[in-house]
Amino acid sequence: MIRHKLQNFVNSLPISPERSCSYYPDRLSQIQYLPLQGKIEKDNLQFFFDSGFRRTGNILYRTSCNACRECLSYRVPLNQFVPSRNRKRLLKKNSDLVVRFGSPHLTVEKEILYLRYQRSRYQSFVIGESDQELLEGMRWNLFGYPENSLEMTLSLDEKILGFMILDSASDSLSAVYSVYDPDYPDRSLGSFAILYSILYAKELGMKYYHLGYFLPGHPDMDYKKHWVPSEIRELDTNDWIPFEEFQKKYADFSW
């Protein structure tokens, strides 16, 4: 009964006007969204994650585009996840890092790192934005709604090399965003942050790790297919099905 009421509530949520897509600028995007006021219960948050929602700032949202269905909600079933040999090498390579989990806490050091990360990784995308504009977005998107959130920091000799914001529901962790120092490419800090937080979720007894949207063939979002085993949310039924099964069913995607 409760899930039925939640589903009816989700179906009634507003849909935004169309705007230029941040992944494909030549396309239009829309989201279905819920502004959060105060703390949301972890069981309810889990229902939203299971329904394909993720969070930015104080907004839970999922894509609801008319002409495109390529933003696929992607999760790792943790009871099946075992680090590969390459993943174990990555853990060993970064074994000198100090990893801490705690409540999200904004510092000047993190702001400076965020700017360096954005200017390095997304140079063409943020070229028209000032540092102040980027930082305002960071503060709202990552630190503006700390309820049910965790921050993981990666440090070397007291210097922060990276941080990651995660949302914690009853049965899963959801990756919100990660930032890392572009001067350490050999460490693969982005992959290390995902791997370490997946293992942390397993330690917590979570069932799933949500990686956000997977866009097959997209230069910035295709990498998620390497985090296996995995499940993709079926848009029409809201069921989560194994990656391989989804791939066969939707052979027209840019796999």
Swiss-Prot record:
Keywords carried by this UniProt record: Acyltransferase, Cytoplasm, Transferase
GO biological process: ubiquitin-dependent protein catabolic process via the N-end rule pathway
EC number(s) recorded for this UniProt protein: 2.3.2.29
Cellular component annotations (GO), alphabetically ordered: cytoplasm
GO MF, one example: arginyl-tRNA--protein transferase activity
UniProt keyword Acyltransferase present: yes
HAMAP family on file: Bpt
Function, in words: Functions in the N-end rule pathway of protein degradation where it conjugates Leu from its aminoacyl-tRNA to the N-termini of proteins containing an N-terminal aspartate or glutamate.
Family classification: Belongs to the R-transferase family. Bpt subfamily.
The protein's name: Aspartate/glutamate leucyltransferase
